[in-house]
Amino acid sequence: MKNYPILIWKLSKALLMRIDLPDPVGFAEVFRKTIRIPFDTEVTGITTDSREVQSGDLYVAIAGERVDGHTFLKEVNDQGANCALVNTVSKESTITQIKVDNPVTAIGKVARAWRDQFHIPVIAITGSNGKTSTKELVKHVLSAQYNVHATEGNYNTSIGLPLTLLQLSQVHTASILEMGANQLGDIAELCDIANPTHGIITNIAPAHLEGFGSIETIAETKGALFKKLNNGVSFVNAADHRVNALEVTGERISFGLTPECDFPADLHHEDDGTIT
């Protein structure tokens, strides 16, 4: 029972998501090859929220603990959705229904296939705190040289990250993805979808302990990012002893406040109170 609030919280975030697809024709081809079923329906957007459906959308029906998205198939059809991704076909709706074992898993597989078309740096950022601010800082720096694709809002979950990836287009030359976690295995799952080339773990702290149970489980969950970067680069915050102790399988680049780091910070407190 103690995990129910976490599941409900995660579901409430997922049900508020919608994107426009940059390449509907390309999406249809990738979807057809990945799901391996006939698919000739034009889809211009994807949503998990029945209230946000727009004409031409693919509606992803998610069955949660308290709300089952399958109960809204008639409504999304009336609002102009072209089709729905479901795990149970409803005879009460005339909308085109694509049956899969798990709609969230299916859209994750499609997103991975979509991501694999792009041979660009994909930087994953996770941590107990500071994910969004770090993402924005990295985005700001890289924008001087790259056309950056990045996570927006709370799109850092098992449904939000796939939707973020499906907004990648040929104009992008780098991607920055925020990854959130609330239980063991979440980051490994997101890495399997995103296939990152670089990774940053901001810190490891006792956040969302109700889902993890211990700080050690948090470290294991976040540390999956570095383990997944066999041929990539892990940026290690050496100032955090838990992050510094994580196993790195690829290239390791450390940063922090000590001279032993590969990139030590040189901070100075000025007389006016500013830090340079």
List the predicted regions and their residue ranges.
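Adenine nucleotide phosphate-binding catalytic loops in nucleotide-utilizing enzymes
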Residues: 215-216, 248-276
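Short beta-strand micro-motifs in enzyme catalytic cores
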Residues: 96, 121, 273-275
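A short acidic, often aromatic-flanked loop/helix-cap motif at beta-alpha or helix-coil junctions
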Residues: 53, 103-107, 157, 258-263, ...
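Phosphate-binding loop of NTP-binding sites
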Residues: 13, 22, 106-238, 242-251
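Nucleotide phosphate-binding/pyrophosphate-handling subdomain across enzymes
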Residues: 52, 189, 271
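Short, polar loop motifs at secondary-structure junctions
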Residues: 84-91, 238-242, 257-258
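Structural signal for conserved beta-strand scaffold positions within catalytic alpha/beta enzyme cores
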Residues: 61, 86, 99, 124, ...
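N-terminal leader/targeting and accessory segments in enzymes
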Residues: 1-109
